[in-house]
């Protein structure tokens, strides 16, 4: 297996397992065997915690760059969330990566503009946000899809449409989250690219992947907060052999 960002991944794996991956790999290359180094060939024992690695992006410093994910490396760092269970570890990681968890106000809203292949998965996500008290807005295709599947949604004109449009809604201060998985591209004039850039400029969290959207919404719906999650002493994570 080849990991493109192994220079980032391996240190995290070593930290949370207590296994010095690089040292062992070098010694194996020099002819030693794992059994001679005190390690077996089976699975490493389960730890009493879960570790989640979350990428960090600096799109506000990268002018004109589309925030939609692709094969290119766009993250500028990563944070590690460690907790006794997956949910708390994910919450730690997302907060450490800069995601905000807001309580919806009377007029708080979310914007949806997603590609056709993602629309079925966003029905449940949109329902959860609606039940939390958010008002939902969507561009024409996304709005029609959500309403068709019994999720109340209001249509908003795209960036190239007449005012009032999605730009006015973004600038209203009422938008807590933008969910945009629509077409990515290098053309900065595309509506989808301009929307994501505008969200970044206004410091509005812009979610561009279904799995991230699911993770964020599940954290929003939980009763947990950072005050409820215990700290993990990272010095105790190492298991000497």
What spans do the regions from the language model cover?
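Glycine-rich phosphate/diphosphate-binding loops that line cofactor/substrate pockets in enzymes
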Residues: 96-110, 129-131, 169-175
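General beta-strand structural signal in soluble alpha/beta enzymes
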Residues: 81-82, 112, 136-140, 155-156, ...
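A general structural motif
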Residues: 86-92, 114-118, 136-138, 157-167
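Short internal beta-strands
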Residues: 111, 129, 133-146
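ATP-dependent carboxylate activation and anion-phosphoryl transfer catalytic cores
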Residues: 4-105
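Peripheral docking tails and interdomain loops at the edges
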Residues: 157-241
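Short connector loops at secondary-structure junctions
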Residues: 141-159
């Amino acid at each position: 297996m080849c990991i493109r960002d192994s220079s980032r991944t391996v240190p995290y794996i070593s930290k949370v397992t207590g296994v010095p991956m690089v040292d062992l790999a070098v010694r194996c290359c020099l002819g030693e065997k794992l059994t001679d180094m005190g390690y077996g060939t089976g699975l490493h024992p389960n730890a009493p915690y879960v570790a989640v690695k979350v990428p960090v992006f600096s799109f506000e410093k990268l002018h004109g760059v589309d925030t939609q994910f692709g094969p290119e490396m766009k993250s500028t760092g990563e944070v590690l969330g460690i907790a006794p269970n997956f949910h708390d570890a994910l919450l730690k990681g997302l907060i450490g990566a800069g995601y905000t968890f807001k309580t919806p106000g009377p007029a708080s809203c979310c914007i949806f503009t997603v590609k056709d292949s993602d629309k079925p998965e966003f029905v449940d996500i949109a329902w959860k946000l609606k039940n939390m008290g958010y008002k939902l807005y969507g561009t024409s295709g996304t709005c029609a899809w959500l309403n068709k599947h019994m999720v109340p949604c209001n249509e908003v004109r795209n960036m190239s449409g007449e005012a009032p449009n999605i730009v006015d809604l973004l600038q209203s201060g009422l938008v807590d989250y933008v969910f945009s998985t629509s077409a990515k591209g290098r053309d900065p004039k595309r509506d989808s690219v301009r929307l994501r850039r505008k969200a970044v400029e206004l410091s509005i969290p812009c979610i561009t992947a279904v799995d991230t959207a699911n993770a964020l919404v599940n954290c929003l719906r939980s009763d947990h907060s950072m005050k409820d999650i215990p700290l993990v002493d990272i010095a105790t994570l190492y298991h000497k052999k």
